[in-house]
């Protein structure tokens, strides 16, 4: 999976994901599914913002090639991918300038046209289920939620999808391509199926010497980027397996 991530995603995205994980003691070489999920989420956030500007009349416009004579402002402020301190600095600046309510959790984007923060979700599960989880966590009608899935489904607050259909289609196509590329390498099942991941984890653990390299403590810290992602079942399975193996070693 790590090799796939480095081949599939832009080096800048990979670097941002690595920094986010390492800052919180997570190793991209071990937490490879999480590594892939963070990179995917970052790319969707960047694609959401790509080519969208506001002209001198305040109207939203799409420009795919830069025109030095055009008086354009980026429609979206990208918050995701920044370190927490800088991200909150950007959020506070936006709130002070626009008067919008400060969110309790770091959002992913700010839309200068609609004057609202946006929370982007990318899920391997049912979009409605994940949308409700996001809404229950945020508990604010001020933050707009937009969920995408790897199957081409999407869901947004009040069915307001913010972007034009073509822009959203680019994101859906990219997610579908990622899924297909994972599947062609035999990675998709372990990325999306908890049982398969658990089976593989047990197999990997059996190949290790008893107690060798097993941690006595498990970190429960969550990286900034993952606060925008769905709960990663891989973490709980790995934690449970390591704990069980460690207890067996203690008894011996």
Swiss-Prot record:
Query: Where along the chain is the active site annotated?
Result: 80, 108
Q: Which UniProt keywords apply?
A: Decay of host mRNAs by virus, Eukaryotic host gene expression shutoff by virus, Host cytoplasm, Host gene expression shutoff by virus, Host mRNA suppression by virus, Host nucleus, Host-virus interaction
Q: Where is the signal peptide?
A: none
Q: Where in the cell is it found?
A: Host cytoplasm; Host nucleus
Keyword check for Cytoplasm, yes or no.
no
* Annotated coiled-coil segments of the chain: none
UniProt-listed InterPro entries: PA/PA-X, PA/PA-X_sf
Please provide the Gene Ontology terms (biological process) for this protein: viral RNA genome replication; viral translational frameshifting
Q: Provide any one GO MF term from the record.
A: RNA binding
List the residue(s) that the UniProt entry marks as the site Important for efficient shutoff activity: 202-203, 206
Description of its domains: The probable endonuclease active site in the N-terminus and the basic amino acid cluster in the C-terminus are important for the shutoff activity. The C-terminus acts as a nuclear localization signal. The C-terminus is recruited to host protein complexes involved in nuclear Pol II RNA processing.
The family annotation for this protein states: Belongs to the influenza viruses PA-X family.
Q: What the protein does? A: Plays a major role in the shutoff of the host protein expression by cleaving mRNAs probably via an endonuclease activity. This host shutoff allows the virus to escape from the host antiviral response. Hijacks host RNA splicing machinery to selectively target host RNAs containing introns for destruction. This may explain the preferential degradation of RNAs that have undergone co- or post-transcriptional processing.
Q: What is this protein called?
A: Protein PA-X
Q: Which organism is it from?
A: Influenza A virus (strain A/Chicken/Hong Kong/715.5/2001 H5N1 genotype E)
Q: Which gene encodes it?
A: PA
